[in-house]
Amino acid sequence: MSAPMVGMVVLVVTLGAAVLALSYRLWKLRQGGTAGIMRDIPAVGGHGWRHGVIRYRGEAAAFYRLSSLRLWPDRRLSRRGVEIVARRGPRGDEFDIMTDKIVVLELRDTTQDRRSGYEIALDQGALAAFLSWLESRPSPRTRRRSV
């Protein structure tokens, strides 16, 4: 095979892999979930917000950014490790991407491997879903009794 032919094969294979990855990501996003906007904190002003879809599955909530090509979730929150630190409405230039009906929650992930903070902006329906998921976790004081 000549060098141009090898280059063409590599290009076609690379483009095919990119199309497959994009198709998989779009398929994952279209499977449903709750719309939300999330950012890592600390953040300055209205910067860092990313639109996405939140999927609840058992003990974890997975956040898939709309603009990401990753095959896995961009953020994963453990129900046992998430704490709500503060609750507020949008402020300043956040109104460029949010309405006054949005609620912003400041979250702290206290699991051993993460120890980070997030802000998540949700409308009323998405907020009810998130709080229901979070509040249905077992109490840390409950222990399994042996029979």
UniProtKB/Swiss-Prot annotation:
- Listed InterPro entries: DUF2550 (IPR019675)
Its transmembrane ranges are: 3-23
Keywords associated with the record: Membrane, Transmembrane, Transmembrane helix
What membrane topology does this protein have? Single-pass membrane protein
Protein's cellular compartments: Membrane
GO cellular component, as recorded: membrane
**Major place of localization?**
membrane
Q: Which Pfam families match?
A: DUF2550
The record's family statement is: To M.tuberculosis Rv1312.
The molecule here is called: Uncharacterized protein ML1147
Gene source species: Mycobacterium leprae (strain TN)
Native organism taxonomy: Bacteria, Bacillati, Actinomycetota, Actinomycetes, Mycobacteriales
